[in-house]
UniProtKB/Swiss-Prot annotation:
The lineage of its organism: Eukaryota, Fungi, Dikarya, Ascomycota, Saccharomycotina. It comes from Candida albicans (strain SC5314 / ATCC MYA-2876) (Yeast). Its EC number is 1.11.1.6. Keywords: Heme, Hydrogen peroxide, Iron, Metal-binding, Oxidoreductase, Peroxidase, Peroxisome. It is an enzyme of class 1 (oxidoreductase). SMART domains: Catalase. GO terms for molecular function: catalase activity; heme binding; metal ion binding. GO terms for cellular component: cytoplasm; fungal-type cell wall; mitochondrial matrix; mitochondrion; peroxisomal matrix; peroxisome. This is Peroxisomal catalase. Pfam families: Catalase (PF00199), Catalase-rel (PF06628). Its main location: other.
């Protein structure tokens, strides 16, 4: 049976396109609730877009434990090989707006929500293992340079390269971004990385620093700069279409999950800080260890309800998993939930895609607010009342934690020559693959050619600290593309 058309209060409407008026061609009547209701709702359809990661695609799936890592982490959803957990993953670009191209040269967001029996776990990752900054106060400045000039409202190569060359700790991520990894062929054919260091613990009270890797079972495929640009013009929703159609056709993408681990003693001996988001952990010294696999096998039924309203936060953890002292991660613990309250409202966790499946959310002091739709805990007191028994579940046996000692001090983690070491190693790695060094130099040159000469000279010097061959190749093409008088 077909549904009956109604207005928002459920009243049947016999003619949806008729409007009440004085005669057939007279003025409209304010009492026409169908018209007023429809227009008022239309005026409020849009919510604020994400300030970063605005353009995205998502799908549901399942995570399965493939290997026992209970010696590292006692999280309940990992306690048994073969155990399965429902998930929702959202992929995204970072800098573009909602209508921007999926193939833009940009990092890709790779956020996954695990609906576990002990609450929702959000792993909010990217497709690159490092990032541009390690001082969180730089984040708003950095993002502004990746967006639009406030005067012209155009993307601005001067802003872009002025910031990066002034903050040289960015070099490693910039090398990744301007390699062909910066333009993935699809969301299915890219990896995901925690980037940040986390702390996981076992039931003995032992804890470990952890980095997580999601390795695409489809392999890595990329686009050249020219291929990505052509697709941006011909099909800006290319990655969204690819993901949706493949899942609809039963071609379910999957990723294998690995961890790298360090003890506190190993971290103290490492040649870099485990809290430095601009560095990777060498695989030879800190090998990958498999623990699971996840498959995306179900498309959303409604994009707005399930993808646009999906809200992830690294502060959403489960027992035996916690953040490290990584300063950028620490700032994200606040910022993500704060932006969701702005975009979606104070009760964003009641939206179905964000709601824990256990139904076991009990925090009686967090009540009321706009769009409270879950019963609001009924008649229960809105505080922890002494006459209402509450269970407090103990889950952590950790006794031996990090010890921090020092005065409160403002600290700017400035770049040093050591920040170019891993970028130099990446340059050598690219030589192993056909044309990848040439593609990197070309991709940088095409972008930097749009900057002023003074900024271009800083770009040449910036990459010269990685390799003079790289800097020379960039300079040669830049001057061909934008000859100087």
């Amino acid at each position: 049976m077909a549904p009956t058309f109604t207005n928002s209060n459920g009243q049947p409407i016999p003619e949806p396109f008729a409007t009440q008026r004085v005669g057939q061609h007279g003025p409209l009547l304010l009492q026409d609730f169908n018209l007023i209701d429809s227009l008022a709702h239309f005026d409020r359809e849009r919510i604020p877009e994400r300030v970063v990661h605005a353009k995205g695609s998502g799908a549901y799936g399942v995570f399965e434990v493939t290997d026992d890592i209970t010696d590292i982490c006692a999280a309940k959803f990992l306690d048994t090989v073969g155990k399965k957990t429902r998930i929702f993953t959202r992929f995204s670009t970072v800098g573009g707006e909602l209508g921007s191209a999926d193939t833009a040269r940009d990092p890709r967001g790779f956020a996954t929500k695990f609906y576990t029996e002990e609450g929702n776990l959000d792993l909010v990752y990217n497709n690159t293992p490092v990032f541009f900054i390690r001082d969180p106060s730089k984040f708003p400045h950095f993002i502004h340079t990746q967006k639009r000039n406030p005067e012209t409202h155009l993307k601005d190569a001067n802003m872009f390269w002025d910031y990066l060359t002034s903050n040289e700790e960015s070099i490693h991520q910039v090398m990744v971004l301007f390699s062909d990894r910066g333009t993935p062929a699809s969301y299915r054919e890219m990896n995901g990385y925690s980037g940040h260091t986390y702390k996981w613990s076992n039931k003995k009270g032992e804890w470990f620093y952890v980095q997580v890797h999601f390795i695409s079972d489809q392999g890595i495929k990329t686009l050249t700069n020219e291929e990505a640009g052509a697709l941006a013009g011909s099909n800006p929703d290319y990655a969204q279409e690819d993901l949706f159609k493949n899942i609809a056709a039963g071609n379910y993408p999957s990723w294998t999950a690995y961890i790298q681990t360090m003890t506190e003693a190993e971290a103290k001996e490492a040649e870099f800080s485990v809290f430095d988001l601009t560095k990777v952990w060498p695989h030879k010294k800190y090998p990958l260890r498999r623990f699971g696999k996840f498959t995306l096998n179900e498309n959303p039924k409604n994009y707005f309800a399930e993808v646009e309203q999906a809200a992830f936060s690294p502060a959403h953890t489960v027992p035996y998993m916690e953040p490290s002292a990584d300063p950028v991660l620490q700032s994200r613990l606040f910022s993500y939930a704060d932006t969701h309250r702005h975009r979606l409202g104070t009760n964003y966790t009641q939206i179905p895609v964000n709601c824990p499946v256990t139904g076991a959310v009990f925090n009686p002091h967090m009540r009321d607010g706009a769009m409270t739709v879950n019963g609001n805990l009924g008649s229960h007191p809105n505080y922890l009342a002494s006459d209402k028994p509450v269970e407090f579940k103990q889950f952590s046996l950790q006794e031996d934690q990090e010890v921090w000692n020092g005065a409160a001090t403002p600290f700017h983690w400035k770049a040093t020559p050591a920040d170019f070491k891993q970028a130099q190693e990446l340059w050598k790695v690219l030589k192993r693959y056909p044309n990848q060094q040439e593609h990197l130099a070309h991709n940088i040159a095409v972008h930097a050619a749009g900057a002023d000469a003074a900024i271009q000279d800083r770009v040449f010097a910036y990459f010269g600290k990685v390799s003079q061959d790289l800097a020379d190749a960039i300079k040669k093409e830049v001057l061909e593309l934008s000859p100087r008088k």
